[in-house]
Amino acid sequence: METTSAFTLNVRLDNIAVVTIDVPGEKMNTLKAEFGVQVRSILKQVRDNKNIRGLIFISAKSDNFIAGADINMIARAKSAQEAEELARQGQQIMAEIHGLSIPVIAAIHGACLGGGLELALACHSRVCTDDAKTVLGLPEVQLGLLPGSGGTQRLPRLVGVSTALEMILTGKQLRPRQALKVGLVDEVVPHSILLTAAVELAQKERQASRHLPVRERILAGPLGRALLFNRVGKKTEQKTKGNYPATKRILDVIETGLSQGSSSGYAAEAKAFGELAMTPQSQALRSIFFASTEVKKDPGSEVAPGPLNAIGVLGGGLMGGGISFVTASKGKLPVRIKDINAKGINHALQYSWQLLDQKVKRRHIKASERDRALALISGTIDFSGFKHRDVVIEAVFEDLQLKQQMVADVEQYCAPHTIFASNTSSLPIGDIAANAARPEQVIGLHFFSPVEKMPLVEVIPHESTSAQTVATVVKLAKRQGKTPIVVADKAGFYVNRILAPYINEAMRLLTEGEKVENVDDALVKFGFPVGPIQLLDEVGIDTGTKIIPVLEAAYGERFSPPANVVSAILNDDRKGRKNGRGFYLYAAKGRKSKKQVDPSVYGLINASGQGKLTAQQCAERCVMMMLNEAARCFDEKVIKNARDGDIGAVFGIGFPPFLGGPFRYMDSLGAGEVVATLQRLASLYGSRFTPCETLKQMAENDLRFWPAQETDPIN
């Protein structure tokens, strides 16, 4: 299929030219290097036709304008010079668009991201639809890059430097009304009149540059700029811990453009883009992007999924409420909640109401969309309305007998084809299905808390689960907006199994005298979003540690927690944030205070809080325990491949994305280095650090988890 058909020029009777963007055979419009020739050809036709009064760029796709540049294009660059040349080509095309003497309008519906927004910025005006699908942003920083086709230069001049810095440094995406407020778009209209509104803009004289607010004009001046960049630089360094080189380059490039002029800015942008594309951080972040894209396309099994028309949820607690919310709001599926009393149902309904109403208040959705989603959720204290549920997700207490009774109830009250999916985090799925009449329709579907925020789910078939059941539940998880990985029915599954030794080692550091904040800060500096001790406080100390005895029983002493630490904390009624008592102090509700450790915890666990280890030593011990267990999971086929293992750790735990996940990280270190580090730690701290056989064999044979060509630095 010819790539030249991605851009089509049509000149209307009123002499307004419309370029329709429609990349053939693909759901999303992305910009590819080979499109440059065609865009230039169209621009030449427009320049040569003196009757054309205006030009409009619009997409033929139902939910995206242009979702960004094709990432494969960057991956194919073999050097910084090649990647820099890609940026220069993009800049030149955008300059040609901007240089047209007639008004050029971007008519935006759906995702307008990365190179898509850079194209829109090159236009003279922008109009977008007032639709939930429409978002505008420059998310390149999330791939370890910066906008390379003029975005770092045009955006500050259009919306002001402080707004531009916030958008480019964080990858923040603006919704239509936000974009209008900051001046990123000129009009917001209903989808039905998008083209009409764009034509009206194109028929007007080219508008003068937008008049920036006084604050933005001050910040663009030398003194204001110096103060702003100094403050933002410190804040960014504090947040990234120096782990994301793209953020510093973004600041440098934008400042260059403002202080030395746009020509210098464009040159600096292209050079920085080329150099960043070759960094290990960008390569790792792009690998996560590719891996998550692949996982989202993976059907889970080769058998076609069963029907997905209506869902049931057992239990109206925190997890049940969250599962119901994503099923209705993301999946657009009717969901019926069954609880033992009306209080549980009301809790789940209120949970969805609060989340949806918050979206309305933030203008992310309309009140009518909120009401439509809520109308999909209903409740019952018996099994009425469950007869025709295709999947029933169980989210009750972690009690084996109770869950087995739930299986029996579903088999009694639901249809013969109904799938029973358990949200257990610790009980074997095979045990839950032990007494089932239809064990092939029993499966694990492990969500992470809070359900509406955490992107990962683990799909856990037991040995009798059918391929169709797997395919159906994987499809449901995707409908719910989740990234599913299929894992084996072994104690702890995957995510909790690699998390537990990491948490245990952090606890050991405390018993050896390390301070709580030093341990947490060490792991945050390493790249985790929060430290292991704070993580326990956030998820609930009781919840976060309940899996450890299960793992200890299954795998032995390497999962043994340091003696009496957890029990001492729990016996003092410390559950973390949820009851305001944990390793950290919590202010009264509604009051904000700086995070502070509760010093009384040291007495509870007989620790001094006077440790001598460096941040690197603390992080190394915790992370190496996680890596060793991840390698065991790979060997035991708990995960299907390294890809799923990396996605599970990054999306489920917050493993540093710029390292690409535990398996890419081990590949970058080399198995020999990982084994040597583990052996050194084992000699210092005990046999729990003994490297697993898989790692030792890989070290001996110089093997990798990922195919070599997928981890080799591009040079």
Curated annotation (Swiss-Prot):
Pathway given in the UniProt record: Lipid metabolism; fatty acid beta-oxidation
Chain intervals for the UniProt region annotation (Enoyl-CoA hydratase): 1-190
Catalytic activity: a (3S)-3-hydroxyacyl-CoA = a (2E)-enoyl-CoA + H2O; a 4-saturated-(3S)-3-hydroxyacyl-CoA = a (3E)-enoyl-CoA + H2O; a (3S)-3-hydroxyacyl-CoA + NAD(+) = a 3-oxoacyl-CoA + NADH + H(+); (3S)-3-hydroxybutanoyl-CoA = (3R)-3-hydroxybutanoyl-CoA
InterPro entries recorded: 3-OHacyl-CoA_DH_CS, 3-OHacyl-CoA_DH_NAD-bd, 3HC_DH_C, 6-PGluconate_DH-like_C_sf, ClpP/crotonase-like_dom_sf, Enoyl-CoA_hydra/iso, FA_oxidation_alpha_subunit, FadJ
Any single Gene Ontology cellular-component annotation: cytoplasm
Record-annotated site: Important for catalytic activity: E118, E140
GO annotation, biological process: fatty acid beta-oxidation
Pfam families named among the record's database cross-references: 3HCDH, 3HCDH_N, ECH_1
Lyase keyword on record: yes
SUPFAM superfamilies: 6-phosphogluconate dehydrogenase C-terminal domain-like, ClpP/crotonase, NAD(P)-binding Rossmann-fold domains
A molecular function (GO) term: 3-hydroxybutyryl-CoA epimerase activity
Keywords, comma-separated and alphabetical: Cytoplasm, Fatty acid metabolism, Isomerase, Lipid degradation, Lipid metabolism, Lyase, Multifunctional enzyme, NAD, Oxidoreductase
EC numbers for this chain: 4.2.1.17, 5.1.2.3, 1.1.1.35
Region annotation (3-hydroxyacyl-CoA dehydrogenase) ranges: 306-715
Lyase listed as a keyword: yes
CDD domains: crotonase-like (cd06558)
Cellular compartments annotated: Cytoplasm
Record's function text: Catalyzes the formation of a hydroxyacyl-CoA by addition of water on enoyl-CoA. Also exhibits 3-hydroxyacyl-CoA epimerase and 3-hydroxyacyl-CoA dehydrogenase activities.
Family: In the N-terminal section; belongs to the enoyl-CoA hydratase/isomerase family. In the central section; belongs to the 3-hydroxyacyl-CoA dehydrogenase family.
Quaternary organization: Heterotetramer of two alpha chains (FadJ) and two beta chains (FadI).
Name of the molecule in the record: Fatty acid oxidation complex subunit alpha
